[in-house]
Amino acid sequence: MGRLRRIGLGLLVLVVVLVAWEPTRVAFQTAMLLPNLLDAGPKPLNLFSAAPVRASFPYRAAQPGEEPDLAELWLPAWASAERPAGAMLLVFGVNNLGRNHPGIERVADGLARTGVAVLVPDSHTLLEGRLEVGEIDGVVRAFQLLAARPEVDRERLGIVGFSVGGSLALLAAGDPRISPQVRWVNAFGAFADASTYLAAVSAHAYPGTDGEPVAWTPTLLAREVYVRFMLDQVDDRDDRDALDAAFSERIFAGERLVRDLAVRGALETDAARTVHDLFTAPSLDAAIGSIGELPSDSLRFIDAISPGRHVEGLSADVYLMHETADHHVPFVESRELASVHEQAGLLREHTEFRLFDHVQPDDLDLIAAAPELVKLLLHVRQLLEESL
């Protein structure tokens, strides 16, 4: 409780500084929203705003015998067809916690109290820890549902994506079905290229500014998603089971593997041998080389989910955020996204923090975190200026 009070006091000071520095309505609203986003200190927004209106809707058809994917809509209490609100679509990543998780509800509730309509889609595929190309279409369909609401102002529509959801958000925003309506996209902790991301998880390293590898330890979740994805590239069941038995648990434990000639020699397919070589790659360059040897279908999939390769069709303003100590996705992935979108004339802001555990607030000392909180305030304010 003492820590929360200190953070609350610190946030109050930041509120005063921000509003005094730039006393605009949006600056004040941003400052009031921040405690809700960080779940820290008193939350004055809850005291001086009406509770949002909330409802669930299916946003894409289900396969026969399956339940449809649902999205949660949060509307400001005052929103109506006569007084529409700007809106945000929140897209979460692989193995996300779902639209009813308290942390997600807190963020959606705070945004709606601030005056923004919010839609949070759930995806069975992502909740199961899998990523498929069809998830881009899912984001498009969720956006269409949000844009069709009479309480929503179609001139003030944006997408906020977290982690893999940020990559999906950038790809969906370029889809011709919705690209004319997407005013802005904010990607937080996204990857630019699935091949460099997979190689980083394999090699426990990412490329530094001088081109030399920088040691990096991916999280258990990152390793689990990586292993699941790579095993899915092996069609032969016996080969897939052999790779799973030989390597999965060791990768989950964080072990750096070496080539196992006995396992490799028993594999029947080229795809399985390539996955073996990736699992046991001795360096970042070797991992990148192994990815290039994957089957053509796998390479097409990697291309399809890599937003850094698909800027065409995107006309929205692009905002990027990343934690510099991120162990889910290396922060250099957002730097690559920034470079690509700046060249395309789309980048509006790229902010790096030392404040979060991937995309969730970290447990930091307030004094050390104060400059990062200021950066967060300024970044979020820009998004609210697009929406309010």
Question: In which residue ranges do the predicted regions lie?
Answer:
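N-terminal cap/lid segment of alpha/beta-hydrolase-fold proteins
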Residues: 29-86
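C-terminal catalytic histidine-bearing segment of alpha/beta-hydrolase fold enzymes
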Residues: 199, 263-304, 308, 335-339, ...
